């Protein structure tokens, strides 16, 4: 169940329901946004608050417009670490150059998708690795459970 939990009203309740329908010996693979100090040192939450409060009928148009406007700037300065550092603090888009080996077109598509995803979600929860591990250990008795920091946050592979 990837890319879903952070978009539900309650992460713990959602994992409990997944666990309820999981057979013994079955794999539970989930992910969740990770808490990152950068969320508070950028305009990320400001953009999110403004965009999520727009009518749903125009949210995609707004995030697509922002991606089309900011992506060329990010791409032009993609190899300049200082400007990228600044852009990542003021730009509303997701940009993954240097993280994933993708073509320019693929980078644009990922930016378009993730810019919409991060700016229009109704619920905004992030976990630290420690708190996510604690949530899982205190509430579940998995035969095996491991949390990894990768992707866009935290990934968990557990066996019931």
Regions found by a protein language model. Give the residues of each.
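C-terminal lobe and adjacent flexible extensions of AdoMet/dcAdoMet transferase-like proteins
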Residues: 100-160
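A short glycine-rich, Lys/Arg-flanked "PGG" loop and its adjoining helix->strand segment in the class I
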Residues: 12-24
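Conserved class I S-adenosyl-L-methionine
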Residues: 27-74
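Long, low-complexity, polar/charged, intrinsically disordered or flexibly structured peripheral segments
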Residues: 91-98
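A short SAM/SAH-binding and catalytic strip from SAM-dependent methyltransferases
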Residues: 1-9
């Amino acid at each position: 169940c990837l890319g879903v939990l952070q978009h539900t009203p309650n992460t713990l309740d959602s994992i409990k329901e997944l666990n309820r329908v999981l057979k013994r010996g079955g794999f539970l693979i989930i992910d969740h946004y990770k808490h990152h100090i950068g969320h508070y040192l950028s305009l990320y939450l400001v953009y999110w608050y403004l965009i999520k409060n727009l009518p749903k009928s125009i949210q995609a148009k707004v995030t697509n417009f922002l991606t089309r406007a900011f992506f060329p700037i990010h791409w032009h300065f993609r190899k300049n670490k200082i400007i990228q550092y600044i852009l990542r603090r003021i730009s509303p888009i997701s940009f993954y150059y240097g993280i994933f080996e993708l073509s320019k077109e693929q980078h644009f598509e990922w930016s378009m998708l993730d810019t919409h995803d991060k700016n229009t979600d109704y619920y905004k929860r992030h976990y630290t690795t420690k708190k996510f591990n604690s949530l899982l250990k205190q509430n579940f008795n998995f035969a095996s459970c491991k949390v990894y920091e990768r992707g866009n946050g935290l990934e968990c592979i557990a066996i019931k």
